[in-house]
Amino acid sequence: MIKQRTLKNIVCTTGIGLHTGQEVTLTLYPALANTGIIYRRIDLNPPVDFCVNIESVGSTFLCTCLKNNTYGVQVLTVEHLSAAQSGLGIDNIIIELNGPEVPIMDGSADPFVSLLLKAGIKELNSSKNFFRLKQIVRVEDGDRWAELRPFNGFTLDFTIDYDHPVVNMKNKHYFFNFTSKSFRSEISSARTFGFVDNIQKLKNCGFVLGGSLTSSVVMDKYQVVNSEGLRFNNELVRHKILDAVGDLFMCGYNLIGSFIGFKSGHTLNNKLLRAVLARRKAWEITSCIQGCDVSKIF
């Protein structure tokens, strides 16, 4: 068994919200064992807390949001920071922000991984719990689908399917065997992406107001617009895996199981997690994973 983790020190950063376009300061605090992941909006009076669990997930249109039904407010775009926390196996943290949205940074989880490592990781004197799959659960939406199945480890198998010259048979699929080390080297730096035609339509509707070439991969009808190009030939599908890592962390624990997704996104990932939780025999919270050395994963 391994121990729960939190931060050693307080750290902060400032950035722009992808959808709101607002500047926001993010401050991360250590937390006691069994606190869980708590987001706190201090721009509101009184400050409002959002505890990470599946029932707290609100809108999943274009991003994953957490809601507080008591106050009727949300915190937007938590998935990249959540992926970074999951990637480093952090169980307990308080995240203060002075605005409605987690900053987009460079469009990946890498700046958040660096921020968390700058704070330092501290072990607590309590066993780490995991969300372990015991049965296969699958959800579908037209030709899109997502599935979780039992596995003594954590793997993600993802396929995208865009009718675009940048996407081809060689870079539309990726299989990822999750460890903290492999997450940092293979997944965390993959950036969010969009298409020029869609971006202007979304801006007209009040979304992606903070989007830019420094915070996402942008493609016109033929190619990547960013002068630096892609970080990986298959950066797009790697980012979809990053999103899935963050979305699955909405259960509040690191997951032990195998995820398979075909054209899945935030909404279907959330639907899958809710379908799993609705089947009580399909999962368990446990600190002991027989047949799996979790110390090699985290």
From Swiss-Prot:
Pfam families linked: LpxC (PF03331)
What residues does Zn(2+) bind to?
Answer: H80, H239, D243
Pathway where this protein functions: Glycolipid biosynthesis; lipid IV(A) biosynthesis; lipid IV(A) from (3R)-3-hydroxytetradecanoyl-[acyl-carrier-protein] and UDP-N-acetyl-alpha-D-glucosamine: step 2/6
Reactions catalysed: a UDP-3-O-[(3R)-3-hydroxyacyl]-N-acetyl-alpha-D-glucosamine + H2O = a UDP-3-O-[(3R)-3-hydroxyacyl]-alpha-D-glucosamine + acetate
Show the active-site residues: H266
Q: Which UniProt keywords apply?
A: Hydrolase, Lipid A biosynthesis, Lipid biosynthesis, Lipid metabolism, Metal-binding, Zinc
Instruction: Name one cellular component (GO) term.
Output: membrane
> Which cofactor names does the annotation list?
Zn(2+)
Q: A Gene Ontology MF term for this entry?
A: UDP-3-O-acyl-N-acetylglucosamine deacetylase activity
Q: Name one GO biological process term.
A: lipid A biosynthetic process
Q: What is its EC number?
A: 3.5.1.108
Q: What class of enzyme is it?
A: hydrolase
Q: Which family would the database say this protein is a member of?
A: Belongs to the LpxC family.
Q: Which NCBIfam families match?
A: lpxC
HAMAP family listed in its UniProt record: LpxC
Its biological purpose is as follows: Catalyzes the hydrolysis of UDP-3-O-myristoyl-N-acetylglucosamine to form UDP-3-O-myristoylglucosamine and acetate, the committed step in lipid A biosynthesis.
Q: What is this protein called?
A: UDP-3-O-acyl-N-acetylglucosamine deacetylase
State the gene name recorded for this protein.
lpxC
